[in-house]
Amino acid sequence: MTRQQIVLVGMPASGKSRVGRELASALGLEHRDSDALIEETTGRKIPEIFSTDGEEYFRQLEEEVIERALAYPGVLSLGGGALTRKATRERLRDCFVVYIKAELPELLRRSQGSDRPLLAGDAQARLEELWEARKDYFPEVASLEVQTSSEPVIHVVEQILREVGEADERDDSSQR
């Protein structure tokens, strides 16, 4: 395993954090989650930051946290809206980026009862709006797309491990 940085992207509730933890464990790497890093850095919960300071302030914090996290090897799970910042998308150019996909009904089911600030109110309508606004960013940065709607986490992790290994082999052979 020569990949030093694997980044997971996707919609809220797609499974990025759960897959990230399992993938990092399988690879013997550290897992970081951009939302958790923001909370550690600020000492505040994400909903509080949104309600007090707004989304733009949160996105700036997120961009800074991601930049710092990318300086270290490991698996990094990004928040669902991280790719709305062009600077963040550009920083991912040298990373192996996995787009964690889930169908909208599954995202809605998984997000029920959560305190995600951008899903407040009519969660289905908000998810559809977020999907429309973000859907082009994920494939733009992705090295690999994996579906999590009906797959157990272990199968998703195994698929990523296979692809990362194959990508490493291609990189090694192209450098010969």
Set out the residue ranges of the language-model regions.
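A glycine- and Lys/Arg-enriched "phosphate-lid" helix/loop adjacent to the NTP-binding pocket
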Residues: 94-137
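NTP-dependent small-molecule kinase module
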Residues: 1-3, 18, 22, 26, ...
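Short glycine-rich anion-binding loops that position phosphate/pyrophosphate groups of nucleotides
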Residues: 80-83, 103-105, 151
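Conserved glycine(s) of the Walker
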Residues: 15
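P-loop (Walker A) phosphate-binding loop of NTP-binding proteins
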Residues: 11
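ATP-dependent small-molecule kinase phosphotransfer cores
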Residues: 33-91, 137
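Hydrophobic anchor at the beta1->P-loop junction of P-loop NTPases
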Residues: 8
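Short, flexible helix/strand-to-coil boundary loops that buttress conserved ligand/catalytic motifs
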Residues: 42, 62, 70, 111-112, ...
